[in-house]
């Protein structure tokens, strides 16, 4: 999985801010022909330290992705007080076969997973960083 470093840094900063109030950042992973971006959604959960991707946001992002020739390939969320490893609730709520990226809000550490048959399997990821060139 190739992730945009600038995009991930922005989401990690948002995760740190939300963690101050026991909130989690969450959203969808959108694959644009090999480059995956994290697209934030509203967190519909009313409980601290939990997330629920807003269904209307999910639908809108999925429709926009299809129009652009992209596709939703998974979800992401932050953990405030634990390693970026899927817990039992994360696995139960996951879409079978989708990727899941978890960010540690405190450290910015990120890990990618694939959820299949009730189990989490670690995915390799790397970052793409764009270089600005002078004209």
Task: Locate each region found by the language model.
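Conserved beta-strand-loop surface patch within small alpha/beta domains used
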Residues: 1-72, 80-135
